Design a protein with these regions (language model features):
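All-alpha RGS (Regulator of G-protein Signaling) helical domain and cognate RGS-like helical scaffolds
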Residues: 2-14, 21-189
């Protein structure tokens, strides 16, 4: 007797814990990518050195400013939530901290300020905050995509591209965990 109850993709429940787990995995991949791009391997190699352009500094510094603003925004949002909702906010905030650190680490001495004021959001519980934060994630991802079009160095482009994919996951997780549908995530609503 088969007691397995298959659920379709549309009817499968999406828990905040499952979304949290996917965000953890995505954040870890960005942290590793940031460290890998900044690694200095002394072993001789026959391949060409990775492309690193000093012309990317201004663009990357603008991304640091945006990511620092996201950190401040999530830190401010923590006061409005608790429990699992707080865990989600703290996790995403930690990803943005990692992005600031990765971008600043890549730039080294050319990195600018790593703090910025919070972006405006209306105070409220998780169901009020999550859609607003998702919208900020979408705007932040769009800023990274626009920056990617101008970045010349391969290492910088790789780092920024790795951040974009996680920012998109942040947006989706926030929308879904606040009660949005898969369709709203796919259409960006």
């Amino acid at each position: 007797m088969d007691t397995h109850s298959p659920e379709t993709q549309e009817s499968a429940p999406t828990s905040r814990r499952a979304l949290l787990a996917s965000l953890i995995a995505a954040g870890a991949s960005v942290a590793v990518a940031g460290r890998a791009s900044a690694a200095d391997d002394a072993a001789p190699t026959t391949t060409a050195p990775p492309l690193h352009s000093d012309a990317d500094a201004a663009t990357l510094n603008s991304l640091i400013t945006r990511e620092a603003a996201m950190v401040a925004t999530y830190n401010a949002a923590k006061a409005s939530v608790s429990g699992d909702d707080l865990a989600v906010i703290e996790l995403i905030a930690s990803h943005h901290v990692a992005y600031v650190q990765s971008l600043a680490g890549y730039l080294g001495r050319k990195a600018g300020a790593t703090t910025a004021p919070a972006l405006p959001v209306n105070a409220g519980g998780y169901s009020v905050l999550a859609p607003q934060l998702a919208s900020l994630e979408a705007a932040t991802a769009a800023a990274h995509v626009a920056a990617l079009k101008t970045i010349q160095g391969l290492d910088a482009a790789t780092l920024v591209a790795s951040i974009i994919t996680v920012e998109a996951r942040h947006e989706a997780a926030l929308l879904l965990s606040a009660g949005g549908s898969v369709d709203s995530v796919a259409s960006g609503l």
